[in-house]
Amino acid sequence: MHEIFSCRLPKPGRDADALAPSRRDFLIVVVGTGVVLGYARSTLAAIELPLAAAQQTAPGKFFEPTIWYSIDRNGAVTVNIKCAEMGQHVGTALARIVADELEGDWNKVRTIYADSNPKWGSMMTGGSYSVWQNFPVLSRAGAAGRIALIEEGAKLLGVPFEACTARNGAVIAGGRLIAYGDIVARGNLNRTYTPDQLKQMPIKPPSERRLIGRETLALDIPPKTNGEARYGIDAVVDGMIYARPKVPPTRYDCTVRSIDDSAAKSVPGYIQSLALDDPSGTASGWVMVYADSFVAASRAADLVRVEWSVPGAAQVSEQDLQRHAAQLIADKNGGALVVDDPGMEAAFAAAKLTIERTYTTSTVMHFALEPVNALAFEKNGMFEVHTGNQWQTLALPWLAKALGRSEDKIVMVTYLLGGGFGRRLDGDYAVPAALAAKAVGKPVKMVCTRSDDMRFDCPRSPSMQVLRMAFGEGGKVTALEHHAAAGWPTLAMAPSFMPKGVNGVPFDPYAIHGADCWYTVGAQRLRALCNDLANRSFRPGWLRSVGSGWVNWGLESFMDEAAHAAGVDPVAFRLRLLDGAGRNAGGPPSAIGGAHRQAAVLSRVAQKVGWSGDTPKDVGLGVATTFGQERDMPTWVACVARVRVDRASGRVTVEKLTLVVDAGTIVCPDSARAQNEGAALWGLSMALHEGSEFVNGQPKDTNLDTYTPLRM
């Protein structure tokens, strides 16, 4: 269980500029040791990448027990990372898992971020899956290498296998040792393992771990602060030109009627403007403006005039979307029943008290620091796309359809991401870049301005939730009914990922996560509804914590109102429901303890803030508790917000957030803390400040002058 108390906010009324550190002041306090990042693709030697692969591994003999890492004759361990690095330090965490089981010398560990080679399997980074899902695979891969090295090291030392142990990059037998690098250089490492053998590979007990759970400097921090790191927007190749798009008025079904570039011809460096022909339908109605520099492309794009044929979606407003959501919820026969316990109607019919509430959220944009971009070109029969991306496996079929070639003739090279947040799960921006390069037969680097990015964003859909609760004798909760309507990103982009509800209707789990809670509430009904008007009007996207971000907000707000209606303290009310009865007891492999673990974090945070004590005048405490995106994720969290209200102006100021988190095994504590703090502050930002709306089929806010997230 980890406690986080660092989310204290500045008091209102102070000059924001006086509080804001300069970029130089911020960077100058960050220090660390060096690290090498790179891509193992010798065909791209002319491209500016993080660092050349040749700098990473000593020439000559090396040992590669699995596809996930190799060891060279100097003992350097190079770990292949198939997940995207976007500030969460995933490479450090995954390398740490390998190195701990391998007993590698952490000072000799390096990471390579892999391209879209099919050997890596599905490549997706999001949903808090990376460490959770890769831990078993990578830990067993590390253990397999350790056993093979001990076997060969024992032979070289002339001692039995049983007399040897491994520690910190060496095999030790009594007072003698041989380094891993020497074993690689001198030995005959030919041990192989079948997939079934790897699955059965024993790993260390937690008490013997030396790296997992210990503080360490993230491997990507030094290159990010000294300028060596390379993001997608930094990618270059000889002979490339630049392009900026003219984004059509709606996501779908726009067609170009005419292009007038007469004014753009006055811009030095301007080349031409072309309408893209996209068989995939990803970039319908896009016009690409080419120039010899991004500055020229951007200036020219502002002068190019495009006339489109616009579909009916151009008239859709936020109010239309919410009205449609209300109509969907009112129709009791629609949607997918995710949970549908018997006894629901009887519980409400016999209830001593019932309550019903409706909760809505507005459109939320991503606004990643690095606007979307991609460099694309054809070389030696392969079409290469260089960009920061979270889900290469999803984007490759779109690229194949758009380019008219098979997926094995396309490779995506993933760079560091200047913000992911779910935006780069949707690799739609790779398609127009590739089409732009195909159209002119040369490398093209497409860079969107922030406004372009937002017009083409896949925002978090506006949502509506209706919750009902029934109370029986003694205030016992006897039923909970929960309806949630929103645009469904998985339906728009990956419908094969959608399971079926108990009524046989497919649903988007990422638009309902968090509703199937750990509370014991008697009969439970959970209904997920797709706001089809939203899906027709724009492409809904996944955004930081996905469905849980807005679904749990509705559920926990409702729990407060239910506690008030029942006349029970909000913490006590929740603890009463977190009794671990039935399926809420949880179970293996990851959710052992279930509701009791959620009750533990809730009790702990209440204790830390003095929940039952007095607060100053005009200051109150608010509480919420939730769990990981999936019920079987080993994560439970509770948060208390200390809030001050100015009675004269009505201004609400959140003074402090206190979080307690149980996330099971923590590989990198500092990174886990940072992710929790960032999630809490972003949630606060969306609650108090963020939110846009659709006006005439477009998001109203396309830059940070009107879209106002939480400020430093």
Predicted regions mapped to residue ranges:
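C-terminal catalytic domains of large/alpha subunits in multi-subunit enzymes
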Residues: 99-121, 150-178, 265-267, 402-411, ...
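N-terminal secretory signal peptides
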Residues: 1-21
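Thiamine diphosphate
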Residues: 91, 96, 397, 416-441, ...
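Conserved beta-alpha junction segments in alpha/beta enzyme cores
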Residues: 49-97, 222-223, 229, 234-235, ...
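Flexible, low-hydrophobicity surface segments
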Residues: 2-5, 49-55, 99-101, 106-334, ...
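N-terminal export signals
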Residues: 2, 19, 25-47
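Short beta-strand elements
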Residues: 66-72, 223, 229, 373-378, ...
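Glycine-rich loop/linker segments at domain edges
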Residues: 2-8, 120, 129-134, 185-234, ...
